[in-house]
């Protein structure tokens, strides 16, 4: 997400009839007032060091952009591990995330205005020519309306804005004649059919060539869309209208915003995550500031800044008051139910909320922005990157990190608002982590698991559009930028739109369809910029004083948010039945459950599910007791499963030219050397003969002292391990024989033994899917000598590695101890469903609504539970691990089955919890919402 370029750090008004000079002056005044909050709290960074870091950002951008142009263009995105372009239809489907790809050179368009911000005007001119020459917007492909708007339409408009700026300066782009604007207008008209609904909310997808509903369009049957998807259009559509004079675009975007405002929950003033585009009914009724809603709030405030329409600010202020009243539990931002805003909807937060501190800076609410940003920074320091989702006690919930820019964005705006050099140090940490953990020979690779350091073959276009832009601006002085950044507003994709658009085409109707606005008693809602010298007099350490109590919040404390006694559980009250005491065969216990509104459902597989219907409880107090009982079930289940899991392992390629930059996610074995308890194993790789490793090796001299590569199939894993161990191998990597399999699209599992005593196997054994294994095989074909590191977690890359002329000795193995693996904490038995590549196509037997709570347990009375109304505090006052654990699958191989079926252990308790669907939908929403 992104913030406005002008008017930083305040909620200042852009006058509706202001001249452009007054608008610019207002923006400049806001910045002057906002930058005086503090100038201390960290050692000042010298201009030389800032320039050095700025130059480092430029080099990193060149590495990413250059590799895209060399290896991927004209494809939409670069696949940095395999050094090729991602072309839709030619790669395995990743689900909704692929809806951003339209065969229109997405990364190039998304990077246009970044080139100008980074003072690469020649490259910008070349890129514009390539877009005009090569890009086709009439492809027969179904794309996301939201992603196409913010990335492609926004990219074209941002490129046009800076092209006309450069042309006016008289040095570059003298040939330019609004060609990018013409393309933007063409694309705008292609998106308009999506708005053909009774509500005015757009369909989530559209076919660029055939539109909606036609048989050949393959879309138009959807009924739901996310709030952000429908509410993040006004900036681009209004800019298109004001650039071209065609008012229809702004009118359609305004109608969608008006409808969302009308459908807000009137008592809480919150909006849900997904809405029916035909009826306006809320489909998912949880509300937060992260995935699915985030940029809706952002665009209300920025639409006011860009367009000068008071109604947008009034709506934003109403929502912001509700956010701070219900969702903000400093330093946390926790989702709640729109109808029951005092009850938390979940106990985890997603990475997209990292944009919110930056939006609060634009609003002028600095203190909570500093608090939340510092909390997020502590999570990053623990995991190197911000996990896609993390729990309220800061454990990993979803381990992926697709190189999101939102935290860098908030860091930039907090620095501009406070002048505190602390935020320069934060930016420096981001640069170091990107180079240390994400940089690969062909660009920067997304992190598949922040705990192991494994990579995903993915570099999204927003990484170039946003990350480098914000990092460069963080360290740049005004003279380093060839234009005045304060004259522009940033879209959610960090594209630049000129503020002078507020004075053009003002004939567009601003009919107020809002009922009434809530009177809000808050000085932050003033229509002028706050004077920070008055707000924070003589306190240069203001920001530091706010951060200090949060320094150890991740490692040493368990923040519990605000305890809402008046709306939550009775303080000190105990439920009549504790989860640990419950017995399904006890009639008295069943009667107590009935009183609390909890019923038992016997499932076909012999398990029992607990479901709470609050309205069926004997009283509101009993309903609260039932809710607490369900929460205890979750905690009990989590604790029971903690010690039953084995975490994934890592295979790290450390020889030239990789130097540890490529990390592959590997499955462990239930036998052999345990890498979490022993030293890592380092060695060169060699293929075994026979390749399946099912008989005595015929090339023992080739694998002696090396890590043997073996193909899956034909015999047991343990038999393969014994054969390569007898040949002198120091470790083994089993590569899947199912072509195209990948840890991106299949659940990781443990290699099981053969039913015999496996204590004789002393070497470590790891499993790689076909896609990951092919990376090693390709490296062998190209470089012959390939050295890898087998460990429980990717080793920090030593700078000395890249200075070594020759690879280390082939016999140099098991040197340097690995760090202890962080506990695995993903959703139980859902490794194959959490990924966006796996849509939620199998659900638990019961699917209660948002007013229901559900839990399941096995007949053995290993009980667990789930509730949508999670609180952040444990009942006994201790920090409780609320992470859901991944159920690793064990698998043996049969002699005569080349296509081995994957058996799993009995379905664990939590896999039937009632909020399973919501959890999966939330992850998929993150992939839709500017992943």
From Swiss-Prot:
Pathway it works in: Protein modification; protein glycosylation
Localization: Endoplasmic reticulum lumen
Q: Where is the composition biased (Polar residues)?
A: 808-828
Residues involved in Ca(2+) binding: 492
Q: Basic and acidic residues composition bias: which ranges?
A: 790-800, 830-844
CDD domains hit by this protein: PA_EDEM3_like (cd02126)
The outcome of changing residue 147 to Q is: Loss of ERAD activity
- Chemical reaction(s) catalysed: N(4)-(alpha-D-Man-(1->2)-alpha-D-Man-(1->2)-alpha-D-Man-(1->3)-[alpha-D-Man-(1->2)-alpha-D-Man-(1->3)-[alpha-D-Man-(1->2)-alpha-D-Man-(1->6)]-alpha-D-Man-(1->6)]-beta-D-Man-(1->4)-beta-D-GlcNAc-(1->4)-beta-D-GlcNAc)-L-asparaginyl-[protein] (N-glucan mannose isomer 9A1,2,3B1,2,3) + 4 H2O = N(4)-(alpha-D-Man-(1->3)-[alpha-D-Man-(1->3)-[alpha-D-Man-(1->6)]-alpha-D-Man-(1->6)]-beta-D-Man-(1->4)-beta-D-GlcNAc-(1->4)-beta-D-GlcNAc)-L-asparaginyl-[protein] (N-glucan mannose isomer 5A1,2) + 4 beta-D-mannose; N(4)-(alpha-D-Man-(1->2)-alpha-D-Man-(1->2)-alpha-D-Man-(1->3)-[alpha-D-Man-(1->3)-[alpha-D-Man-(1->2)-alpha-D-Man-(1->6)]-alpha-D-Man-(1->6)]-beta-D-Man-(1->4)-beta-D-GlcNAc-(1->4)-beta-D-GlcNAc)-L-asparaginyl-[protein] (N-glucan mannose isomer 8A1,2,3B1,3) + 3 H2O = N(4)-(alpha-D-Man-(1->3)-[alpha-D-Man-(1->3)-[alpha-D-Man-(1->6)]-alpha-D-Man-(1->6)]-beta-D-Man-(1->4)-beta-D-GlcNAc-(1->4)-beta-D-GlcNAc)-L-asparaginyl-[protein] (N-glucan mannose isomer 5A1,2) + 3 beta-D-mannose
The main location is endoplasmic reticulum
Signal peptide range in chain numbering: 1-42
Tell me which Pfam families the record gives.
Answer: Glyco_hydro_47 (PF01532), PA (PF02225)
Tell me one GO biological process term. proteasome-mediated ubiquitin-dependent protein catabolic process
Enzyme class, broadest EC rank = hydrolase
Description of what induces expression: Slightly increased by endoplasmic reticulum stress.
Which cofactors must be present for this protein to function? Ca(2+)
Q: Which GO terms describe its cellular component?
A: endoplasmic reticulum lumen; endoplasmic reticulum quality control compartment; membrane
Q: Which family, according to the similarity comment?
A: Belongs to the glycosyl hydrolase 47 family.
Q: Write down what this protein is called.
A: ER degradation-enhancing alpha-mannosidase-like protein 3
- Species source reads Mus musculus
Q: What is the lineage of its organism?
A: Eukaryota, Metazoa, Chordata, Craniata, Vertebrata
Q: What gene makes this protein? A: Edem3
């Amino acid at each position: 997400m992104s913030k406005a370029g002008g008017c930083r750090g305040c909620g200042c008004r852009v006058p509706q009839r202001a001249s452009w000079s007054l608008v610019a002056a207002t923006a400049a005044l806001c910045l002057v007032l906002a930058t005086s909050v503090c100038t201390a709290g960290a050692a000042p960074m010298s201009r030389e060091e800032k320039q050095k870091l700025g130059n480092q950002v430029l080099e990193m951008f060149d590495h990413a952009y250059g590799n895209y142009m060399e290896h991927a263009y004209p494809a939409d995105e670069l696949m940095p591990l395999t050094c090729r372009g991602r072309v839709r239809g030619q790669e395995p489907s990743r689900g909704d995330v692929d809806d951003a790809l339209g065969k229109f050179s997405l990364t190039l368009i998304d990077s246009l205005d970044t080139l100008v911000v980074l003072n690469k005007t020649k490259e910008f001119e070349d890129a514009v020519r390539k877009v005009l020459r090569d890009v086709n917007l009439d492809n027969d492909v179904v794309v996301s309306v939201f992603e196409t708007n913010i990335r492609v339409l926004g990219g074209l408009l941002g490129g046009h804005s800076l092209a006309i700026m450069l042309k006016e300066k008289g040095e570059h782009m003298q040939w330019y004649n609004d060609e990018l604007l013409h393309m933007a207008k063409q694309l705008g008209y292609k998106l308009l059919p999506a708005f053909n609904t009774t509500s005015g909310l757009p369909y989530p997808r559209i076919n660029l060539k055939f539109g909606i509903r036609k048989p050949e369009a393959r879309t138009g049957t959807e009924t739901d869309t996310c709030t952000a998807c429908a509410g993040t259009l006004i900036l681009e559509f209004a800019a298109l209208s004001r650039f071209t004079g065609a008012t229809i675009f702004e009118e359609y975007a305004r109608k969608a915003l008006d409808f969302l405002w009308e459908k807000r929950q009137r008592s809480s003033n919150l909006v849900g995550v997904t809405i029916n585009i035909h009826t306006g009914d809320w489909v998912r009724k949880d509300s937060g500031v992260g995935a699915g809603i985030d940029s809706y709030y952002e665009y209300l405030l920025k639409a006011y800044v860009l367009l000068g329409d008071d109604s947008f600010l009034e709506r934003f202020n109403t929502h912001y008051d509700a956010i701070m009243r219900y969702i903000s539990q400093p330093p946390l931002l926790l989702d709640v139910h729109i109808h029951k805003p005092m009850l938390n909807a979940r106990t985890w937060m997603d990475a997209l909320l990292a944009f919110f501190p930056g939006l609060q800076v634009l609003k002028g609410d600095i203190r909570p922005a500093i608090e939340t940003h510092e909390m997020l920074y502590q999570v990053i320091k623990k995991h190197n990157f911000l996990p896609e989702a993390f729990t309220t006690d800061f454990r990993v919930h979803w381990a992926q990190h697709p190189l999101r820019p939102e935290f860098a964005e908030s860091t930039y705006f907090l620095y501009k608002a406070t002048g505190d050099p602390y935020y320069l140090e934060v930016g420096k940490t981001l640069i170091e982590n990107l180079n240390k953990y994400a940089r690969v020979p062909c660009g920067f690779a997304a992190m598949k698991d922040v705990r192991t350091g494994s990579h995903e073959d993915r570099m999204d276009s927003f990484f170039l559009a946003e990350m480098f832009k914000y990092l460069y601006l963080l360290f740049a002085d005004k003279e380093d930028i060839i234009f005045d950044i304060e004259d522009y507003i940033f879209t959610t994709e960090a594209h630049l739109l000129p503020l002078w658009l507020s004075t053009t085409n003002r004939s567009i109707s601003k009919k107020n369809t809002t009922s009434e606005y809530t009177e809000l008693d808050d000085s932050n809602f003033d229509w002028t910029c706050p004077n920070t010298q008055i707000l924070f007099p003589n306190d240069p350490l203001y920001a530091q004083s706010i951060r200090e109590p949060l320094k150890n919040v991740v490692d040493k404390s368990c923040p519990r948010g605000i305890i809402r006694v008046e709306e939550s559980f009775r303080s000190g009250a105990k439920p009549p039945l504790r989860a640990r005491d419950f017995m399904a065969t006890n009639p008295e216990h069943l009667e107590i459950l009935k009183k609390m509104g909890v019923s038992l459902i016997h499932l076909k597989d012999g398990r029992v599910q607990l479901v709470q219907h609050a309205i069926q409880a004997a009283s509101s107090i009993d309903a609260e007791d039932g809710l607490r009982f369900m929460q205890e079930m979750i905690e009990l289940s989590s604790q029971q499963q903690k010690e039953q899991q084995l975490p994934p392992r890592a295979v790290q390629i450390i020889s030239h030219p990789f130097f540890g930059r490529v990390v592959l996610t590997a499955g462990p074995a239930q036998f052999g050397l345990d890498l979490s308890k022993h030293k890592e194993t380092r060695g060169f790789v060699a293929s075994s003969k026979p390749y399946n490793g099912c008989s005595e090796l015929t090339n023992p001299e080739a694998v002696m002292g090396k890590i043997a590569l073996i193909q899956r199939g034909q015999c047991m894993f343990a038999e393969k391990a014994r054969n390569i161990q007898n040949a002198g191998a120091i470790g083994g990597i089993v590569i899947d024989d199912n072509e195209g399999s990948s840890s991106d699209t299949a659940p990781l599992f443990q290699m099981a033994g053969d039913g015999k005593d496996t204590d004789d196997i002393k070497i470590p054994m790891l499993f790689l899917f076909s896609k990951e294994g092919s990376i090693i095989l390709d490296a062998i074909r190209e470089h012959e000598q390939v050295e890898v590191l087998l460990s429980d977690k990717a080793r920090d890359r030593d700078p000395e590695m890249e200075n070594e002329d020759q690879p280390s000795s082939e016999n140099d193995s098991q040197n340097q101890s690995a760090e202890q693996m962080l506990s695995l904490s993903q959703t139980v038995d859902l490794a194959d469903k959490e990924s966006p590549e796996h849509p939620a196509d199998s659900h638990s037997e019961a699917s209660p609504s948002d007013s229901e709570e559900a839990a399941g347990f096995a007949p053995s009375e290993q009980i667990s539970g789930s509730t949508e109304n999670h609180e952040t505090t444990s009942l006994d006052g201790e920090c409780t691990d609320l992470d859901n654990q991944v159920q690793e699958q064990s698998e043996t191989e049969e002699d005569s089955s080349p296509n081995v079926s994957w058996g799993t252990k009995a379905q664990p308790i939590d896999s039937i919890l009632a909020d399973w669907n919501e959890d999966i939908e939330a992850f998929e929403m993150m992939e839709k919402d500017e992943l």
